[in-house]
């Protein structure tokens, strides 16, 4: 299994480092461009939510740790932050059937992540949020293997 990790300051300016890290990992593992793009979308949504809603303005000097793992057909993403407790698996996403004007703002990023992964686990350990995601390469995102759909409602 190939593995790599990075620790970032919880600041928007660090996103370029995260992009370069993920892009390099994807190329090293030989992921096709569409899968590399999906990985970048997942990390963009998680990072932006953590920095914007979970850490700032509550915690100055927060950190975000990202670990990636690859074994043929399976991409693992671990995202850890020291922000406010937040379980995205328990978060009720937006009602996409509702008219745009009626729908509240927010929640689409979590919905996007849910649609791109096959397995997810969350836990709060100490003062940190731990989110573990698995994306199976070669299996369409919306086809959840029996018994593996997280929380009955996606990520």
Residue ranges and their predicted role:
Residues 15, 19-22, 113:
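Heptad-repeat coiled-coil signal-transmission/dimerization helices
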Residues 10, 31-34, 70:
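Structural signature of the histidine kinase catalytic ATP-binding subdomain
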Residues 1-5, 51-155:
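Conserved beta-strand-loop-beta-strand hairpin that lines the nucleotide-binding pocket
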Residues 20-44, 48, 102-104:
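Conserved short strand/loop->alpha-helix "switch" segment adjacent to the catalytic nucleotide/phosphoryl-transfer site
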Residues 5-17:
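STAS-typified acidic loop motif
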Residues 17, 38-41, 74, 115:
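Alpha-helical macromolecular-interaction surfaces
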């Amino acid at each position: 299994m190939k593995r790599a990790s990075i620790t970032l300051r919880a600041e928007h300016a660090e996103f370029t480092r995260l992009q370069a890290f993920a892009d390099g990992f994807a190329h090293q593992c030989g992921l096709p461009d569409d899968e590399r793009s999906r990985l970048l979308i997942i990390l963009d949504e998680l990072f932006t939510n953590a920095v914007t809603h979970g850490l700032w303005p509550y915690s100055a000097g927060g950190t975000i740790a990202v670990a990636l793992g690859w074994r043929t057909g399976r991409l693992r993403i671990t995202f850890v932050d020291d922000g406010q407790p937040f379980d995205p698996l328990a978060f009720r996403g937006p009602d996409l059937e509702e008219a745009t004007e009626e729908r509240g703002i927010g929640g689409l990023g979590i919905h996007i992540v849910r649609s791109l992964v096959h397995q997810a686990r969350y836990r709060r350990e100490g003062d940190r949020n731990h989110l573990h995601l698995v994306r199976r390469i070669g299996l369409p995102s919306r086809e959840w293997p029996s018994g593996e759909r997280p929380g009955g409602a996606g990520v």
